[in-house]
UniProtKB/Swiss-Prot annotation:
The active site is at residues 92, 335, 366. CDD domains: thiolase. The gene is FOX3. This is 3-ketoacyl-CoA thiolase, peroxisomal. It comes from Encephalitozoon cuniculi (strain GB-M1). It catalyses: an acyl-CoA + acetyl-CoA = a 3-oxoacyl-CoA + CoA.
Length: 391
């Protein structure tokens, strides 16, 4: 049974994902990425920007500059000055958490229409600067927060028996799926073409033809005997994403088609050295809270930080690869960290629509320093007026 008070998604769009420092989006500032995503979703849905009551965007690699960039980009997209804008930073989970925050504001009645999303120009910042603290302190878990994501992925892979060949095979599969989806036009509905200079950019730049033979000779990045290489790890990227949510009643009044219903969001903590298993903990807790089993979920999008990391998650969750990341993931598409959480919502809903998957879909990411996030959506083929409760 559906209700007029349900929180629903009426649009989920993103920019193409550019390769950081050398891609076609490298000349764009953060605020320009924001403008592209927000303007794109306003134009695609046809919503009057004056109806948007709040904007929350995920962003990671800056604080003050990010807040200013978000505000500038949103204003330039046509959203009025009266609409408040803020950024949040839960690292790779930021974009998905923004969706959860806007949804909860709508559910609580504080707003009726809101925009979520995320942005990141990793070109602008490159790799985060390393810092050190003395090891062997009083709190081992606190010290483990300094572990790089690659180190954590290597440890998880070793613990769960992920081999180099398995990681490479997964990476090749991700690239092949993304390339096939691109050729078939499956991303067209979620990507906002961008005019950069004299060129229109409308494809993700990280997707490429590859094979085991071309990547098996690459050297490990984090350990000499490790499994993580530049080919089976996510890419540094530039991009932005946007998700428009509102009450179902408002969608009906505005004549906007419902893409999916937002059900729930969760953030969890776990040992920092187990960070890569964040999706396992988050998904299991999310499903339990909503009285669901994994076999009741039609489809999963789990962010591909590293092939070894996502393989560990699939093994722990006991989910077949055919139910996950059918159009590839961050290994192929790229990982603009502040935007990726909302990006996987875009792709989750694209897959479910294109593949005619009804029922529940889950989006999830691992998050640095020992966290995981997950969100639950429901997609139906349609509803009749008598199916709607006047609540």
């Amino acid at each position: 049974m559906i209700s007029h008070e349900d929180v629903v998604v009426v649009g989920a769009l993103r920019t193409p994902i550019g390769r950081a420092t050398r891609g076609k989006l490298r000349s764009l500032r953060n605020d320009e990425l924001v403008t592209a995503a927000i303007r794109g979703i306003i134009e695609k849905t046809g919503i009057d920007p004056r109806l948007i009551e709040e904007v929350i965007l995920g962003h990671c690699l800056s604080s003050m500059e990010g807040n200013v960039a978000a505000r500038m980009g949103v204003l330039r997209a046509g959203v009025p000055v009266e609409t408040p804008v803020m950024i949040i930073n839960r690292l790779c989970g930021s974009g998905l958490e923004s969706v959860g925050l806007i949804a909860e504001k709508i559910r609580s009645g504080r707003i009726e229409i809101g925009l979520a999303g995320g942005f990141e120009s990793m070109t602008s910042y490159g790799l985060p600067k390393e810092y050190t603290l003395s090891r062997g302190g009083a709190c081992e878990d606190a010290e483990d927060c300094m572990l790089t994501l690659g180190e954590v992925s290597e440890m998880l892979g070793k613990t769960h028996g992920v081999t180099r060949s398995e990681a490479d095979e997964y990476a090749v599969t991700s690239q092949k799926r993304a390339l096939e989806a691109t050729k078939k036009g499956h991303f067209l509905a979620e990507i906002i073409p961008m005019r950069v200079g004299d060129e229109t950019v409308e494809r993700d730049e990280g997707i490429r033809e590859t094979s085991l033979g071309t990547i098996e000779s690459l050297k490990p990045v984090f350990r000499q005997d490790g499994v993580c290489t530049s080919a089976n790890s996510s890419q540094l990227s530039d991009g932005a994403s946007a998700v428009l949510l509102m009450k179902r009643r408002r969608a009906d009044e505005l004549g906007l088609p419902v893409v999916a219903e937002f059900i729930d969001f969760i953030a969890v903590g776990l040992k920092p050295r187990d960070m890569g298993l964040g999706p396992v903990v988050a998904i299991e807790k999310l499903l339990k809270r909503n009285g669901l089993e994994k076999d009741q979920i039609s489809y999963f999008e789990i962010n591909e930080a590293f092939a070894s990391q996502v393989l560990c998650c699939l093994r722990k969750l006991q989910i077949g690869e055919d139910r996950v990341n059918r159009y590839g993931g961050s290994i192929a598409l790229g990982h603009p960290i502040g935007a990726s959480g909302a990006r996987i919502v875009c792709t989750l809903l694209s897959v479910m629509k294109n593949e005619a998957l009804e029922g529940y879909g889950v989006a999830s990411l691992c998050v640095g320093a020992g966290h995981g996030v997950a969100a639950l959506f429901r997609r139906a083929a349609g509803s009749k007026p008598q199916d709607i409760k006047n609540t």
